[in-house]
């Protein structure tokens, strides 16, 4: 069961009577609860941008105790000098017999001043272990397995073909439902993700607000040792407390985790000729200080019909002002016949040329242009700042050192 609607002002209570009816902070909360506000923006942001929620919890967060440096640091140093070459990786993870939870399975791939990208692998649930990211919100893009995200606001169910966003500062734990789970993770430290403007598309299309789902209140009332791991200023810290931090019995507000089924994306595409720009596939965006230039765009290339006439249908050859990090959830990407599979990653930074490989080009340039259905799901994290690659990703054996060879078959066919 979920609450529906992107950015709506929601309210939910796991126990009847836990929510105050006429105010936020009563002198004495019902059921012996404590009122606590969680702010996602400054108090004075314009009303349409203002994000906050009121939580009614068994214990206030201030009881969590002292934080100490954690033994594992998820953030990794970047390569000192990065060439303008295109880069691609095969999937980093194979199945492991070693127990590995969500935090232990994070692998830092690349970052920019306000965005970082990781992959995650987990085959073990976080039972009495919790995570919070004070540095930004987290966008989950799974490609294998099913996980349940137990958050301060309630539970989200997540599997391949769906996404979830955990806001900055919200504590959660990951329960692994399948044998193992794998996915991509994007950390956004800029403006919170929101729906893109639709412009001439009109009032409807792309991701519809009513399809975004928010959790109903659920809580843990358990004692014993509970470990909280917190990412704060690019470092991991931990504390041990004697009560679960997921102790919110009721909440109301517009700052909360949410999930979305990508199959509900209303894809816009040409029904005449040419290939529209990929901005028409934007699901969520984080706006920068420059109008029309995003800090982060989350873009998908979903299952869709291709019907353009007298047109080269795959993505065109391109040198981009923006910086692209791509992944594949399932299927075969229409611009890459080989080498780019689910779990893989490619990075094409500003002005780095990219486009269909030679085999894909040859097929698309000569095929009979009948309506064609593409059953795949690729995505892109696009940012205005260069993707800096971590040393561990740059030197990882899954990096395809021969990636540029996929474009070496092209010949000069010009004739006057």
UniProtKB/Swiss-Prot annotation:
Ordered alphabetically, the record's keywords are:
Dioxygenase, Iron, Metal-binding, Oxidoreductase, Phenylalanine catabolism, Tyrosine catabolism
**Keyword match Lipoprotein:** no
This enzyme catalyses:
homogentisate + O2 = 4-maleylacetoacetate + H(+)
One GO cellular component this record assigns the protein to is: cytoplasm
Where, in this chain's numbering, is Fe cation bound?
318, 324, 354
Q: Does the keyword Oxidoreductase apply?
A: yes
State the EC number(s). 1.13.11.5
Q: Which residues bind homogentisate?
A: 333, 354
Q: A Gene Ontology biological process annotation?
A: tyrosine catabolic process
EC supergroup of this enzyme: oxidoreductase
Q: Kindly list the cofactors needed.
A: Fe cation
- Active site residues according to the UniProt entry: 275 (proton acceptor)
Please provide, alphabetically and separated by semicolons, the GO molecular function terms listed in this UniProt record: homogentisate 1,2-dioxygenase activity; iron ion binding
Q: In which pathway does it act?
A: Amino-acid degradation; L-phenylalanine degradation; acetoacetate and fumarate from L-phenylalanine: step 4/6
Membrane-spanning ranges = none
What the record says about family reads: Belongs to the homogentisate dioxygenase family.
Q: How does it assemble?
A: Hexamer; dimer of trimers.
Instruction: State the function annotated in the UniProt record.
Output: Involved in the catabolism of homogentisate (2,5-dihydroxyphenylacetate or 2,5-OH-PhAc), a central intermediate in the degradation of phenylalanine and tyrosine. Catalyzes the oxidative ring cleavage of the aromatic ring of homogentisate to yield maleylacetoacetate.
Please state what the protein is called: Homogentisate 1,2-dioxygenase
- Please give the organism: Legionella pneumophila (strain Paris)
Biological classification of the source: Bacteria, Pseudomonadati, Pseudomonadota, Gammaproteobacteria, Legionellales
